[in-house]
């Protein structure tokens, strides 16, 4: 049986850190920024770590 392919859409959106955690960017940033507060826009600039409860599901999608 051939290897499972990684989900290409997900590969482009996340990075795996050296310790195996999953890093992702904040959502709701691409447009309609005038309706958001300065604080919301500033805090969404930085990437954040994915929640632990999502690790198992996402690691299965990006296995190599």
Curated annotation (Swiss-Prot):
Pfam families: Ribosomal_L35p (PF01632). GO terms for molecular function: structural constituent of ribosome. It comes from the Bacteria. GO terms for cellular component: cytosolic large ribosomal subunit. Transmembrane segments: none annotated. One of its GO terms (biological process) is translation. The keyword Glycoprotein does not apply. Keywords: Ribonucleoprotein, Ribosomal protein. Disulfide bonds: none annotated. Signal peptide: none annotated. Belongs to the bacterial ribosomal protein bL35 family. This is Large ribosomal subunit protein bL35. It comes from Mycoplasmopsis pulmonis (strain UAB CTIP).
């Amino acid at each position: 049986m051939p290897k499972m392919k990684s989900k290409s859409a997900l590969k482009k959106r996340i990075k795996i850190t050296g310790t195996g955690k999953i890093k992702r960017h904040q959502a709701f940033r691409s447009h309609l920024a005038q309706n958001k507060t300065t604080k919301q826009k500033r805090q969404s600039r930085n990437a954040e770590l994915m929640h632990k409860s999502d690790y198992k599901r996402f690691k299965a999608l990006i296995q190599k």
